[in-house]
Amino acid sequence: MALPLYDSQPARRVPWVTYLLIAVNVVVFLLTPMSNFAAWYGNGSVRECKATHFTFEYGAVPKELTTGDQQPLPTEVVHDCGPAGFRKAPWTTAFTSMFLHSSALHLLGNLVFLFVVGMGVEDRLGRWRYLLAYLAFGLVAVYGFAWTSPGSTVPLIGASGAIAGVMGAYVILNPRGRVVSWVPPVIVIRLPVWVVLGYWFVLQWLSLGDEKSNVAYTAHIYGFVAGVVFALLARRAGPAHRLAALSRG
């Protein structure tokens, strides 16, 4: 798989919102028990249990989103880590889950894609429309995943659904763009954006039946499609509308 490194077409202005989203995701990760940086959570099994409770508290549990009711923790979690000591409004987790990551590698993988495609989409949409679109893509991805697996009590976390939406929008808003990508083991090549992101989308689709994976491929697909649809509508709005948006951003 080709890993995108940077957009060969530089942005026309500083992508402050993309930088802000990257910074927020990094800071949130460092302050959660999933990060070794947050030493105040303890070590070993204590940290693992706090990370588990934290994930269930702020992650998006499909059954909670579809029913509107907080669900009890799984029996094995209660056995190993004790009962939940929190109450939550399930709908809020559709937002909070977008900023949680299970590991530094999970975080890095998401932010690489956001860095590459986010700047271009922000450049074309304007800062506020881009920020609102990012959050909307994330919501579509989270709720799409929940509707597809309404009985699941496994929390969904990660920014990948929202970032997938940005990727879908990028393909439409910059169809002739090229992305400098790393093809393992040593090849660095400039590829058309539709090749890199189209290949990524096909991989997500083909991986839907992988029951052993803990990757939310369905959320990725919902987010990507939401980004494509949004960008098509934005493009149809006309050049004047887009220029006005750019001047406001």
Regions found by a protein language model. Give the residues of each.
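A detector for small-residue-rich transmembrane helices and their helix-helix packing motifs
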Residues: 1-249
